[in-house]
């Protein structure tokens, strides 16, 4: 079910479009759109319905494929750069904390060391974490991504 509806003129005026060729492109697109918007209207109405239960849908796929993880990490790096300039600071911290949760979730579920060019964002996640529980997880990840993964999956 989709709950996002955008004015075409707004998207064009701000140069907003989906990144082509990546999975989970909405995870990168939606935050950029919301940060550009001067006004957002929330509604409980279904705007449109799409079938994500079809065979091969990434929404319901078991586990994480290498491509899914690579695309997610690329998205998270892109969002980290965007979030660096967000004001006010409280909003920036909340966005970074959410990004930390997404990154740590990905690192817990997939052994990222096998990815070409992978560099664990150990200190970045520690800087981004806000809540005590998330800071503890980020600290463990910073000390040892392998131990973090074992603890999270035990």
Residue ranges and their predicted role:
Residues 108-154:
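Membrane-interface aromatic/basic loop that binds lipid-linked glycans or pyrophosphate carriers
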Residues 71-74, 91-99, 129-143:
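Short secondary-structure transition/capping segments
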Residues 1-63:
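Conserved nucleotide-sugar donor-binding catalytic segment
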Residues 45-54, 60-87, 109-125:
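Catalytic core of nucleotide-sugar-dependent glycosyltransferases
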